[in-house]
Regions:
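Acidic, low-complexity Ser/Thr/Gly/Pro-rich repeat segments typical of extracellular/periplasmic
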Residues: 2-190
């Protein structure tokens, strides 16, 4: 018979897998959305990194109209709670960029999107492109791409007075962008 030896457990292989979505309340691409919250459940504890810089909501919502948790503490779900009613017949996209990471290793769930509509259909148009700079060979790696409605009230100063209806960012080195779930109409791309 021998005495136990002191030591630390060796652990296992390093986790290189990003978090996986296991359940949604309500489901992705829900129509006639009328709930006051959305919950996205994961297979492991997650945390949100740089949410303020990474999250893109299209069309934009005032930050006072929704709260996102967890912030600061790990959890097995992400919650979007609405503090005010949403306009009808609108398709919303919450793009989390690279903010959703697992708690232990920091593996990123890249560009996870949650999409829903307050109307009876989802807007399905999209636009994509690549950023080029006429002066520099290499454009900045972080570029904002914005769409403004091009209608009877459009003026060339709209970009200084109003927020864009849709926007995205080039958050990686590819300098490519895509904006999806657009409502049919004319837009100015900035």
């Amino acid at each position: 018979m021998q005495c136990a030896r002191r030591g630390s457990p060796s652990g296992g292989p390093i986790d290189e897998t990003p978090p996986k979505v296991v359940r949604l309340e309500p489901n992705q691409k829900t129509l006639n959305f009328n709930s006051d919250r959305i919950r996205i459940y994961f297979d492991e504890y997650i945390k949100l990194n740089e949410l303020r810089d990474q999250l893109v909501v299209s069309p934009p919502l005032e930050q006072s109209k929704y709260l996102i948790s967890p912030q600061g503490l790990p959890a097995k779900y992400l919650q979007i709670e609405f503090t005010d009613s949403l306009p009808s017949n609108t398709t919303y996209t919450f793009n989390f960029g690279q903010s959703i990471v697992d708690n232990n290793e920091g593996n990123v769930l890249p560009f996870y999107k949650y999409i829903f509509s307050t109307g009876s259909s989802l807007d399905s148009l999209s636009i994509s492109g690549q950023i080029n700079d006429a002066i520099k060979r290499n454009p900045d790696s972080f570029v904002s791409v914005m769409l403004y409605p091009y209608d009877s009230v459009f003026t060339d100063s709209i970009i200084f007075k109003d927020k864009p209806i849709y926007y995205t960012n080039t958050l990686d080195s590819l300098k490519e962008f895509t904006i999806e779930n657009l409502k049919s109409g004319k837009y100015m791309l900035v």
